[in-house]
Amino acid sequence: MHAPPLRTLRHLATALLATLLIGAVAAQNVVEISVAHTMTGGAHRDAFDRIIEAFHEAHPTIRIRQIPQDMEIYQDTGLIAMLQSNDPPDIWFQWGGDLVRRDAELGFALDLTDYLAQDGWGDSFLDASWSEGTGTMVGDRIFMMPYAFDVTTVLWYNTDIFAEHGLSEPETWDEFLDIVRTLRAAGVTPIILGNQQFWPLGNWAGHITARVVGMDLFDKALSLEVPFNQPAFEEAFQRFAELAEAQAFNRDLAGLGASESMAAFFQGAGAMHPIGSWLISNAFSSAPDGFSYDAFNTPVIAGGAGDPQSIIGLATGFEVSSRSAHVDEAITFLRFFTSFDHQVAWAEAGRFSPIEGAMAAAEIDVHNKALAELFLDANELVPPPDTGYPVEIADIFYQGAALVAGGLRSPAAALAWIDEQLALVR
């Protein structure tokens, strides 16, 4: 065998070097955008992954790096630790309301108002996206781009269990209590719920309380303008005492996690499960074949000062870091994500898209359609206490409600305890 001519070797080396240089330059030109969120599974995570894959094909010089965290870790310590670090994510998931206000006031979140005003991008969203109740704005400035509307508590129920015991959806609180008693007498756990982190029961407790005392008093108490220990709130907390007396909950209510209780509901461990609209996307991937379920809003509470047909909910969405070195690329991704076709796919994965017309165009689950109609038709939107108000205030309210629902304290004693604890944070 003859050795190749020296000239040929030089040509090969030159070509190889050129290829390496082109690859290095191309790699240097690729921008990475980090996105922190709580989508650890479910149909909506699959849809999000597919949207990112399509984005990479359309924008080969921008790569999306996902930072998923369990929701409870993310909400408690995960997100704030990232935001306070020297390398915060470029984009992160947030709940609308007080947390958006916090992120804006502390300088974490970028003002998105002018970006959304470009090329009619903001006009592609439903009007509810920019209403006070959804929590996307601080004053007249937009700091969170909504990616879904969430009804944060309805009563999901196992339709087979209801049918077996001859039960139908209740219209009033008294009818609801009758259902609870019937199920308990039959040896069925009426309500399966994991309240280890307090918010699952706490959100529902917030809705019940707002229904009884009215939004004005509800807002004043959670804003620390008036005490909780007064007759109107005692009347509201009496509803939790009624649930405790009827043995409505699973015995491990205080120790069970939110995810575990949802999984238990899918397996038939309880007849009802009070939680939000995200159950739908989880049911797509986690509920067994043949699992049949439906939902009803918190029943009408007689004599309540609040709107008897109110819902509890908010917008969730993405914020952009004010410290991001790649704001334009982050906005490019968000515009791609909220484009009509991708939002139709998002809706079909079980999320309530905020984009005009996406829900109507999507082939969506009947449950998702029903909750979308419930959200848009509601005259009053009650903010979840842990997003509409400072978390430290909401947590104390949640713990007080849990004391009553667990049969550990009377309504009056729990309300006195709430005021004592709040005195330390005023």
Residue ranges and their predicted role:
Residues T113-S129, V212-E235, S285-P288, V300-Q309, ...:
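Short, solvent-exposed loop/beta-turn-alpha elements that line the ligand-binding surface or hinge
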